[in-house]
Regions:
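A short acidic, Gly/Pro-enriched loop at the edge of an enzyme's catalytic core
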Residues: 125-135
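A short SAM/SAH-binding and catalytic strip from SAM-dependent methyltransferases
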Residues: 134-148
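Surface-exposed loop/turn positions
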Residues: 70, 131, 164-165
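Class I (Rossmann-like) S-adenosyl-L-methionine-dependent methyltransferase catalytic domain
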Residues: 2-72, 78-91, 96-124, 168-252
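Short, flexible/disordered intra-domain loops and linkers
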Residues: 148-150, 179
Length: 252
């Protein structure tokens, strides 16, 4: 399923692959889960279990989705931090990443019922139409500087999901003004001391230089409209106007 008029820039896709390959070779764990537990493999994978318990399990329960025997796909799998937990629930796990080096390292762990595949950074080529039950992505789109690449992943999710399949994406959901390679961002803090209530979150405005670490923000209404235009029903949105916005839904 292509999005007419929405084509990621080749220069960005090449830069993303190059930079994340370098990061994977330098210290994959540090760049995936920056940086405190990067030197301890056990703690690194334990953090994946914690994030799964926080961001995946409750969503599956809210949507009354039973993952057993189902196919789950993760966009931006890295070296398998969350995959190591996800394979316990799903009948089959597919992890995709823009970095072939990340994929090589993830494959080396030989997780059961798991396959890993390098992708271009803007599509899910090689994944069958209507062959996936759940698509998940965490701490990935925030690093993508090309908004069209993010939206292509939305479209590819609509393509690969079975009818009634579900998805959950994390992204930066800030107000933005694009100025070429720069981006003005405005939103609400989501720091640990300000997450208990929206009223206690303080506003901020900042200027960001877009690269393969500081990616685009997607405004909440824009994310919802794009999903709906692709036949993806948005069931819930959390963390609007923060760097921890979640969009979850179901294929119609």
């Amino acid at each position: 399923m292509a999005i007419e008029g929405h084509k990621p820039e080749r220069k960005w896709l090449d830069a993303i692959r190059r930079d994340w390959d370098v990061r994977a070779r330098e210290n994959a764990r540090a760049f995936i889960n920056w940086p405190d537990i990067a030197d301890e493999e056990g703690a690194f994978f334990a953090s994946g279990r914690e994030d799964y318990a926080m961001y995946v399990t409750p969503f599956l329960k809210r949507t009354q989705f039973d993952p057993h025997g189902k196919v789950g796909l993760e966009i931006g799998c890295g070296i398998g931090r969350i995959a190591s937990r996800m394979v316990e629930d799903f009948g089959q796990y597919i992890g995709v990443d823009v970095s072939p080096e990340m994929i090589r390292k993830a494959s080396s762990y030989e997780l059961p019922r798991a396959t890993f595949q390098a992708v271009s950074g803007g599509d899910l080529n090689g994944i069958s139409d209507s062959g996936v039950d759940f698509v998940f992505s965490f701490a990935v789109f925030q690093h993508v500087p090309d908004k069209e690449a993010i939206f292509n992943y939305f479209a590819e999710t609509a393509r690969v999901l079975r009818p009634s399949g579900i998805f959950r994406f994390h992204m930066k959901g800030l107000w933005t003004l694009a100025l070429g390679r720069m981006q003005i961002e405005a939103g609400l803090s989501n720091s640990a001391s300000h997450v208990t209530a929206r009223a206690t979150r303080f506003p901020f405005v900042r200027l960001r230089y877009l690269d393969t670490w500081q990616g685009r923000s997607i405004r909440p209404a824009e994310a919802k409209a794009k999903c709906e235009s692709l036949g993806l029903e948005v069931l819930e949105m959390e963390g609007e106007w923060t760097t921890m916005m979640w969009v979850g839904g179901r294929k119609k």
